[in-house]
Amino acid sequence: LDYYWDDVPSDKQKEIFQQQVDLAKKHQKPIIIHTIEQFLISTNIDEIVVAVPQNWISYTEDIINRYCKDKKIHVIQGGATRNETIMNVCNYIQNISPNEENIVVTHDAVRPFITQRIIKENIEMCKEYGAADTVIPATDTIVHAKYGQFISDIPVRSEMYQGQTPQTFKVNEFINVYNSLSEGEKTILTDATKVYVMREKKVALVEGESYNIKITTKYDLKMANL
């Protein structure tokens, strides 16, 4: 699980973190706890690694110990980006449990409505194809505007999907593929699965759920009714 999103500015991430604090003060479970609980009950998950910014580690450990303390939960420092964070997690996993067959199921800490089906199917697809991404079909027409002013293209909607998480990878393969990228290639990454796409590797699709939302605003929190 991670608190890093390449598409969420740092000031918004601070606001999201403050939501966790405010919920705890109201004696309500922080969003991340709801998320962790879904992975704790999964029979397919051996260890849970929560990656957060350095200055969030102490608080994250405190709320985990308060609500769902478990020896399989580990809190570590993430990286400067989503993909660097995944690399930190992958390296941590290989240090505590070296295994060529290790799989990492990466998930946004603020997507608490993850289902057991989605977790299970991510792992199954990853075992078969090497990587998996959770998506839902696009319901609106997608417009491509290369320079943000005029329409460049309108893709066929039936071929378009909206990305969610989890995104799931074989640990060693992710490390190898990511390390094969140049620094220039790494700077343009906006999504973990693009690491694979850039190296023309298959990423299998897993059907998500419309309610598997990322809670990043007060409106999202109200709609989630947590």
Model regions: which residues?
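Conserved N-terminal catalytic core of the sugar/cofactor nucleotidyltransferase
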Residues: 32-101, 181-184
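Hydrophobic helical membrane-anchoring modules
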Residues: 212-226
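Divalent metal-binding pocket/active-site signature
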Residues: 1-33
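Short beta-strand-to-loop acidic/aromatic patch adjacent to the donor-nucleotide binding site
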Residues: 98-110
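Hydrophobic packing residues within well-ordered alpha-helices of enzyme cores
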Residues: 60-64, 122, 224
